[in-house]
Design a protein with these regions (language model features):
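C-terminal transmembrane helix and the adjacent membrane-cytosol boundary/short C-terminal tail
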Residues: 2-12, 85-87, 91-95, 151-162, ...
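Interhelical loop and adjacent transmembrane-helix boundary motif
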Residues: 2-5, 49-58, 200-250, 254-257, ...
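Transmembrane alpha-helices
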Residues: 11-12, 17-24, 139, 147-151, ...
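Loop-to-helix entry region at the N-terminal start of transmembrane alpha-helices
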Residues: 17, 60-67, 117-145, 185-187, ...
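Short membrane-interfacial helix/loop motifs at transmembrane-helix boundaries
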Residues: 22-56, 207-212
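A structural signal for multi-pass alpha-helical bundles of membrane permease subunits
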Residues: 22-36, 64, 115-126, 193-198, ...
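Transmembrane alpha-helix signature in integral membrane proteins
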Residues: 32, 56-87
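Membrane-interfacial helix termini and adjacent extracytoplasmic/periplasmic loops
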Residues: 37-42, 46, 112-142, 173, ...
Length: 271
């Protein structure tokens, strides 16, 4: 007989959630504070969000972050999908363990180590650090997350759908484009959104690989906070939290859609 949650478990859960989310809630609330003093409540106001629109440096950093996020997410989606296809479809090829380890290494490797390694690489090949080096760094970081999402979908994929298409004379490439790709498209889109949100709030890798004219939004926020917390920082952080949360919700919905398609496809085939 299953026991219900004890008071200790409920208390521990409540304290854990409070420890994680109360500071975020305070930041969001104080982003609407009318007072310039961040510790003194002066009433509700959208003043600091309006002032963000006139902060040229912050807007430039936001644009740089958006461009890097879109490019790195697109590159990570393509490379991660190809890596997932190789790991699932090619079986136990020679070097599979090494290949998989290299793909998933950023999951377990501290970002400081990854950032330092990339910095040494860029210095060794004499590449000017800036927009493109950050893009490469973020692609390296997010590729593994895309590979995990797509690989999980491919592992549950019904290969008989592809076999039926090829039995009807459909060539392999057309089979992939018309049968496989539409069914794994939600997983690919979910991986793209996840990679984009991870790129948006990365600070460590960007700090190692940034250069002149490539100040991302997290770096800009960090440099501003070192001089003291301002109400504008609360506002821009609230916007970042909202964007990342929305991205994670979209990724979760797409992942569920991918699973639902995978479950319904065999039924349609049998019919």
């Amino acid at each position: 007989m299953r026991k219900g949650p004890t008071w200790f478990n409920v208390t521990a859960l409540a304290l854990g959630l409070a420890f994680l989310y109360v500071p975020i809630a305070i930041l969001v609330v104080y982003s609407f504070n009318a007072s310039r003093l961040v510790t003194v409540w002066g009433g509700w106001s959208m003043r600091w969000y309006v002032e963000l629109l006139h902060d040229a440096a912050m807007l430039e950093s936001a644009l740089v972050t958006l461009r890097i996020g879109l490019l790195s997410a697109a590159a990570a989606t393509v490379l991660g999908t190809l890596a997932a296809l190789a790991l699932v479809r090619f079986g136990r090829f020679r070097g599979r363990i090494l290949f998989g380890g290299m793909i998933y290494a950023p999951l377990v490797m501290p970002e400081v180590i990854t950032g330092l390694s990339l910095l040494l690489l860029f210095v060794a090949v004499d590449v000017d650090r800036g927009f493109w080096t950050i893009t490469v760094a973020h692609t390296t970081l997010t590729l593994c997350f895309v590979a995990i999402v797509v690989q999980a979908r491919l592992a549950d994929f019904d290969r008989s759908l592809e076999e039926a298409a090829m039995d009807l004379g459909c060539p392999p490439l057309k089979t992939f484009l018309t049968v496989t790709l539409p069914l794994i498209a939600p997983a690919i889109a979910s991986g793209f959104v996840l990679a984009f949100t991870l790129s948006l709030d990365d600070l460590i890798l960007a700090s190692f690989t940034t250069g002149p004219g490539a100040t991302t939004l997290p770096i800009r926020i960090y440099s501003e906070v070192r001089l003291g917390v301002k109400p504008e920082i609360n506002a821009v952080c609230t916007i970042l939290i909202a964007v990342v949360a929305a991205g994670l919700v979209v990724a979760s919905l797409m992942s569920k859609l991918s699973g639902a398609r995978g479950e319904s496809a065999p039924i349609g085939t049998q019919a």
